[in-house]
Design a protein with these regions (language model features):
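Leucine-rich, amphipathic alpha-helical/linker segments
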Residues: 10-17, 30, 97-98, 102-103, ...
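Positively charged, polyanion-binding regions of nucleic-acid-associated proteins
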Residues: 92-95, 100-121
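Long, low-complexity intrinsically disordered regions
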Residues: 112, 116, 120, 136-145
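DNA-recognition alpha helix
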Residues: 124-140
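Accessory, usually C-terminal, subdomains that scaffold auxiliary metal cofactors
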Residues: 143-206
Length: 206
């Protein structure tokens, strides 16, 4: 069972985040094979460059994101991840982002899910910027974010959703691609206490 502790955390404005699918898959494969432990991800990433980072600083940045996301789930999640195809694994990576980024979780809940429910299949830059501005109005920490930082976070959201197969390739208006969730995925997310996140991905009301 996974605790969605991110709901008690501050809203971050992550300007350099990515889906990191291949990096997360590499780490999970090594953990399940007994070749890596989560606390060692940072050291192994720096010493052996297992994520093929372009620099030491980038290696550290990737390792921090991968560690944060893997720490947010349990061993059952890692094992389930390993059994799924690439498309499902990318969706599971999106779930891991939601579990570690309060801002992204709220965006997916209030914007992406509502689009699915209303059968509005276009995500506009203005939808994402409007979300951030509403967040700034209600949260004093978010109110300090710069416009430049918000635009970078917006672009990161689009990039992650595109890589996960949930958004079309490019443009200020992008077509939303409804995720395909089989019964096994639904049952697993429900059993892990992630019913809310399942409903976000499925475009269902609470």
């Amino acid at each position: 069972m996974i605790t969605v502790s991110v709901l008690n955390q501050r809203y971050p404005c992550r300007t350099r985040d990515r889906l990191w699918y291949r990096e997360i898959k590499t780490a999970i494969d090594k953990i399940l094979a007994g070749d890596l432990t989560t606390p060692d991800i940072g050291k192994v990433s720096l010493d052996d460059n297992i994520f093929n980072a372009s620099s030491a600083s980038r290696s550290k940045e990737i390792a921090q994101a991968v560690t944060r996301r893997i720490n947010a789930v349990d061993s059952a999640y890692l094992s389930f991840f390993a059994t799924r195809n690439m498309e499902n694994q990318q969706l599971l990576c999106i779930v891991m982002v939601m579990l570690t980024d309060h801002s992204f979780l709220e965006f997916m809940d209030t914007v992406y899910r509502e689009k699915l429910i209303q059968h509005d299949d276009i995500l506009r830059d203005s939808d994402i910027m409007g979300f951030f501005h509403r967040l700034q109005e209600k949260d004093e920490n978010a109110a300090k974010w710069t416009d430049a930082g918000i635009k970078k976070a917006r672009d990161n959201y689009k990039s992650m959703l595109k890589e996960a197969g949930m958004l079309s390739e490019s443009g200020t208006e992008r077509k939303i691609i409804r995720p395909i969730l089989d019964k096994e995925m639904e049952d697993f997310l429900q059993s892990e206490g992630l019913a809310r996140i399942y409903k976000i991905l499925a475009g269902e009301r609470e």
